[in-house]
């Protein structure tokens, strides 16, 4: 009879393997239920046959078995929404780019300037491939480049090659790859080849296909060189110490950014007078500032660079907008400089400095050495310290003999022109809704229509921090309306007419 009972039990549990641990599991489960706790002992793992069947349909639950059966997890993992996929890829890009510090990787130490001064500005700085080899990047360039290539392949797999957001992400990943390759070639002509690919060149044409950035540089050189600044109004003396400048900027940013903790600090390692980070601005220890300088820093570093970083950080899906790959540099730097113009805070000397850097990059591309460019800056009236700093900006990372500069400084003037054209065209074609998205984060112009279109489905959040003239576009609309007419008026003929009129003044 015992054998028949065992046989019947086998029939009732047809297909199941014997389990010697079941009584112990049942006892533990009953104890957990009595104590009001969740079951802590998992059911036995199904064998391969059971697992393969459960994918198609979960096995029926035996009412005599206190443990419910659990189907195996799908091989592909849980279902993910489009926004989840984008956010995960964006997070991966942000994390992958974190150790990349372009300006840190190509900086020169103070001894270089001292040696150049001792040589009476006649000997090339001793900065070459061996010099940069001693400065670690903080990552393996080949491995980091391969990581970004894998991210680009993941984007194609997850989003497809025709997805517009995917195209932005892919371009961003591949630009970071090329940035890493550029840094891996410091001190060689290959560095310049990547720099030109990433940041452009003064020889690049504007969208009209005819006018180059160099053409703009030569035109502005003639105009700005002839401006007599003594006739323009009051002079702004640089008498404000760095700590006082930082305190004033902290006060202004507290009013502008409110609860967002944007801080201004004094830094003794800066090469420039000021620089912006994601939520901070640093001013160089020992530098002195005028009230106009502080006005410019408020707009340039705060209203644009910090604000776009904060707007990007506020994104829950489009997280890549908080970081600025080279493809966004022209819009970022040009927008900051253009806001100086819109707020009437800039001045001819500063405009000349930006334009002269374009011409200096062009000269270096055409073979001028560090000493040649340094001497050119001296002929333009800069003091020797500023000559060195301007020339260093152009040759850092490249080849001091000439022919292979760092071309980033060409982005500022190009960005002024292209941002102005973007804003004017948006107003002319009744697409003013796109203009605020210049501030949604670190963007290129081709990104803006795509990002604006994805607000409704939650992929992108509109920008929170906008400069006053972009929160209320009425003034810019009138400005651009008249600007459109002025460009069609026939500039030379009008200028000649007034030149004859001015001649009457003697």
Predicted regions and their residues:
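Conserved alpha-helical "signature site"
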Residues: 350-506
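Secondary-structure capping and boundary motifs in well-ordered enzyme cores
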Residues: 290, 294-295, 299, 327-332, ...
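Active-site recognition of the HExxH zinc-binding catalytic motif
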Residues: 295-312, 336-337
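Post-HExxH zinc-binding segment in Zn-dependent metallohydrolases
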Residues: 322-362, 415
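N-terminal low-structure segments adjacent to metalloprotease catalytic domains
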Residues: 2-214, 476-480, 485-506
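Contiguous, non-catalytic segments that form substrate-binding/exosite surfaces or channel walls
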Residues: 159-292
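Post-HEXXH active-site segment of zinc metalloproteases
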Residues: 292, 307-332
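Active-site-adjacent bridging/hinge elements
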Residues: 274-280, 307-312, 386-392
């Amino acid at each position: 009879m015992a054998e028949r009972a065992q046989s019947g039990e086998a029939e009732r549990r047809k297909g199941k393997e014997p389990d010697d641990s079941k009584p112990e599991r049942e006892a533990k489960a009953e104890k957990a239920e009595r104590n009001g706790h969740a079951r802590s002992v998992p059911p036995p793992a199904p064998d391969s046959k059971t697992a393969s069947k459960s994918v198609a349909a979960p096995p029926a639950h035996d009412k005599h078995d206190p443990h419910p059966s659990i189907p195996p997890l799908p091989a592909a993992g849980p279902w993910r929404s489009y926004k989840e996929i984008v956010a995960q890829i964006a997070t991966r890009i942000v994390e992958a780019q974190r150790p990349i510090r372009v300006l840190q990787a190509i900086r020169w130490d103070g001894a270089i300037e001292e040696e150049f001064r001792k040589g009476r500005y006649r000997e090339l700085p001793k900065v070459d491939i061996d010099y940069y080899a001693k400065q670690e990047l903080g990552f393996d360039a080949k491995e980091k480049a391969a990581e970004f290539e894998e991210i680009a392949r993941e984007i194609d797999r997850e989003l497809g090659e025709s997805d517009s957001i995917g195209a932005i992400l892919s371009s961003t990943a591949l630009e970071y790859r090329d940035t890493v390759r550029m840094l891996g070639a410091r001190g060689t002509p290959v560095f310049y080849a990547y720099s030109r690919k990433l940041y452009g060149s003064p020889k690049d044409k504007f969208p009209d296909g005819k006018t180059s950035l160099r053409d703009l540089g030569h035109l502005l050189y003639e105009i700005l060189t002839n401006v007599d600044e003594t006739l323009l109004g009051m002079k702004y003396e640089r008498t404000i110490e760095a700590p006082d400048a930082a305190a004033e900027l902290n006060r202004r940013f507290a009013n502008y950014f409110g609860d967002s903790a944007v801080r201004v600090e004094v830094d003794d390692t800066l090469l420039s007078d000021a620089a912006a980070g994601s939520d901070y601005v640093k001013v160089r220890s020992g530098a002195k500032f005028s009230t106009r300088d502080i006005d410019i820093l408020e707009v340039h570093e705060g209203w644009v660079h910090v604000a776009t970083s904060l707007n990007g950080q506020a994104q829950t899906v489009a997280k890549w907008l908080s970081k600025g790959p080279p493809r966004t540099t022209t819009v970022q730097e040009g927008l900051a400089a253009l806001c100086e113009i819109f707020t009437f805070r800039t001045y001819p000397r500063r405009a000349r400095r930006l334009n002269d850097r374009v011409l200096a990059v062009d000269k270096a591309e055409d073979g001028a050495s560090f000493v040649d460019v340094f001497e050119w800056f001296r002929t333009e009236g800069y003091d020797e310290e500023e000559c060195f700093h301007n020339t260093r900006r152009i040759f850092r990372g490249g080849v001091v003999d000439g022919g292979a500069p760092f071309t980033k400084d060409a982005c500022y003037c190009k960005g002024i022109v292209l941002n102005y054209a973007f804003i004017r065209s948006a107003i002319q074609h009744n697409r003013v809704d796109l203009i605020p998205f210049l501030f949604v984060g670190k963007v290129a112009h081709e990104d803006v229509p795509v990002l604006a279109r994805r607000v409704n489905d939650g992929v992108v959040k509109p920008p929170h921090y906008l400069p006053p003239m972009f929160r209320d576009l009425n003034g810019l609309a009138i400005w651009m309306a008249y600007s459109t007419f002025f460009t069609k008026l026939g500039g030379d003929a009008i200028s000649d007419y007034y030149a004859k009129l001015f001649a009457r003044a003697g």
